[in-house]
Amino acid sequence: MDIAHFRGIEQMSWRIPKGTHFLALIGPGDSAKSTILSAIDMALSDRWNLAITDSDFYQGDVEKPISIRVALSDLPTSIRHHDMLGMSLAGIDDASELYEDPDDDHDCCAVIALTVDKSLEPTWTAFRPNKPEPIATVTATARRLIGAYKVDERIDTHLRWSRTSALGRLTEAEHGADELLLRASREARKAVSEAIPPELSELVATIQQRLHALGSGEFKDLKPGLDQSLSTSTGNLALYEGPVPLSNFGLGSRRLAGVAAQQMANADKGIILIDEIEYGLEPHRLANLLTCIKDRTDSALAITTTHSPTALRHLDVDDLGIVRRDSNGTVTVKSFAPDQTYLQKLIRRSPEAFLARRVVLAEGKTDYGFLLELLDRWNAELAEGCKPSSAAIGAVAVEGSGGDTIEWARVLADVGYDVVLFIDSDVENDRDAADALTGNGVAVVRWKDGYNIELAVTDTLTASELTVLIDKAIELSDDPSSYRSNVLDHLHAYGLPEEVTTLLVEEWNEHGVGLDGARATVARAAHRRSWFKRVDKGRALAALLLEAEGYPDSDSASKVQELRDAVFAPAPEGRDTGAPDNPSNATEQ
């Protein structure tokens, strides 16, 4: 698929891996995900009267035409033998490179090219490489054989019988809609309850089965009925559940009912497009819809977009297409390699990472809580100055998983995410591996060599502040009354003389324990006995550091500032800027 000069896309070239049957496009807002679906729909649908305006041209520049080109392989016999399409086939290899003619080493493919110039008149032609001029016009009839459709969001339209609705087209295909609707309308003048021909009742029973499969609701008395909100006979026959029209149900139920009707009306079509698949659905119904679409055997390809962490939790990493758009309007869609399935752990734990523009990876629970506390304080400060928060710039904090965190950072950077890695520096191998990621564009922020987060904090505290830290660890434990003695045991195990029986660090000096020794002992005990190994405890640790008397002039303060600079840094040159799809068009495309 190649797109040029369409809405927020100045240029895009995308090759969907061979054998793909389901894809969920993800990425930050305004990265052109919905535009990609619209482009496929416009190029392959059988509509001839596309509603195109000047704002559909990239930056409103109508002097350069819109160009959308889609190559389709695995063609059904009806297309290969078609009078026009069958004579215009090209070749395509496993790497999606096109050839003028198919041969024994290539699959045959049909390449449909949609062009719109400043006259706003669309033209569809067949394309073959090395042919300078369009070789044939692709008619609406020919495009109908391709079988692509985008789920229509005009939900209530498809819950009524009319010439253009899904129910109307489904009825026309099976029974002849005009005659049935006329009969129903005439009978309705006598008695609404007896107005429904048996053919419609049988059809509704089939629709009810489909609604139940998609999880739309538990319908027991689904039937056609007259929608009194419409004044004409065209389209006032609608689906009812008992005495209530489905158009009066909640958004999720209506949307699933509309999806079911459209699926059935387009049962012969091989490409289904759904924008924002989670719209209006609770998590359990969203999960069921995803399963139904992924398991469909009658479609060659389903492409959806989503901003839902719930949706991602029910998908595999190889179901995802990561969409990125740079400041010049160049759009890329990348997928994870098959050997990167270990990222499934990350998508289950922190799906929001895949939906962000910038991912800030913290090594563990303590670091993650520490980072969250910093972000809250920074965002509050920015709000006072009317400046964008971390959420506004698309940055999200993500809890890592020890040794896996560095590899997660590498892979996320490879597929286009801005990544900030926040880790300890007490393990030499991890330190070296993290530093090596700077060549991949990862911003690595770590404490000075040999330091973990506990030591970075205690190294800044006074004796009385160390006592406050110990008291906070006890306060946040599961059983503070018994944990106090445990803490003393921990300290003895990591260097505190046995004769010291107090947790008041100010008194340790009387037993020969100076401030530097106290800091090291408390840090070792806190780290190895996991005093702060919980998100809320990590937050408390950050607060202790930020409120310490010596913090402003400390090395830890400079590292925290380095972290802040990385989180709020401008997007790297050429990366996704988050600008609207089309500055000349106020609505998101």
Put a short name on every predicted segment.
Residues 168-256, 261-271, 431:
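Extended helical coiled-coil dimerization/tether regions that scaffold
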Residues 37-106:
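Conserved P-loop NTP-binding catalytic core
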Residues 350-360, 366-589:
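Acidic, Mg2+-coordinating catalytic modules of nucleic-acid enzymes
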Residues 1-45, 232-353, 549-589:
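Switch/communication elements of ASCE P-loop NTPase nucleotide-binding domains
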Residues 134-207, 457-464, 471-473:
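Coupling/switch segment of ABC-type P-loop NTPase heads
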Residues 22-23, 149, 359:
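Conserved beta-strand position immediately N-terminal to the Walker
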Residues 84-174:
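A sensor for short, sequence-defined functional sites
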Residues 45-66, 135, 323, 327-330, ...:
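Flexible phosphate/Mg2+-sensing switch loops adjacent to catalytic phosphate-binding sites
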